[in-house]
From Swiss-Prot:
HAMAP family: RecR. The lineage of its organism: Bacteria, Bacillati, Actinomycetota, Actinomycetes, Mycobacteriales. Residues 79-179 form the Toprim domain. It holds the Pfam family RecR_ZnF. GO terms for molecular function: DNA binding; zinc ion binding. This is Recombination protein RecR. It comes from Nocardia farcinica (strain IFM 10152). Belongs to the RecR family. Keywords: DNA damage, DNA recombination, DNA repair, Metal-binding, Zinc, Zinc-finger.
Length: 202
């Protein structure tokens, strides 16, 4: 244990996802050794994120305005919605350049053991988008792109049940090829692109 502010910094860094005690200590001592202007830039970036970043009112991904750039782009195909768990998954699919529709971010996956049920996710908002037409356009296809793990599969199964009531709606799932138990964000562009183009109907 270190004293005072140093230990406070290590403790706060250790709360970040994927940062263990040793990594937190390394980052803390790196920050102690860099020049003050670099610390100022980091502090300014954190302040901008806290004050200026919000969630898109339509799809739920991160945005610097009410609408994200994807939802605001009239060239995107409004008949297709790709459902993902987190904003980072939007970026993973965008890197493939295979998808030209819009997204819907659930904000997680079903996980009863952690207290995450349908009411904690943005499922109602998804159903409303489809039922009310997305910007006046009928949604023809919903692509379920949840992670290929237990929680992601449970979420996909639940969504299929909810979406069956919409006549004429095609519901598809990313094709196999993604490693089971993995996260979408870690899949390479080629694998994810093939999974998207080879998606299967449910």
């Amino acid at each position: 244990m270190y004293e005072g502010p140093v230990q406070d910094l290590i403790d706060e860094l250790g709360k970040l996802p994927g940062v263990g005690p040793k990594s937190a200590q390394r980052i803390a001592f790196h920050l102690l050794q860099v020049e003050p202007p670099e610390i100022d830039r980091l502090q300014a970036a954190l302040q901008k994120v806290r004050d200026g970043v919000q969630f898109c009112v339509v799809c739920g991904t991160v945005s610097d305005g009410e609408l994200c750039r994807i939802c605001a782009d009239p060239r995107r195909d409004r008949t297709m919605i790709c459902v993902v768990e987190e904003p980072k998954d939007v970026q993973a699919i965008e890197r493939t350049r295979e998808f030209r529709g819009r997204y819907h971010v659930l904000g997680g996956a079903l996980d009863p053991l952690s207290g995450v049920g349908p009411d904690q996710l943005r499922i109602r908002e998804l159903l409303a988008r489809i039922g009310n037409q997305d910007d006046g356009v009928d949604v023809a296809e919903v692509i379920i792109a949840t992670d290929p793990n237990t929680e992601g599969e449970a979420t996909a199964t639940y969504l299929v049940r909810m979406l069956r009531d919409f006549p004429g709606l095609t519901v598809t799932r990313l094709a196999s090829g993604l490693p089971m138990g993995g996260d979408l964000e870690f899949a390479d562009e080629l694998t994810l692109g093939r999974a998207l183009s080879g998606r299967r109907a449910l």
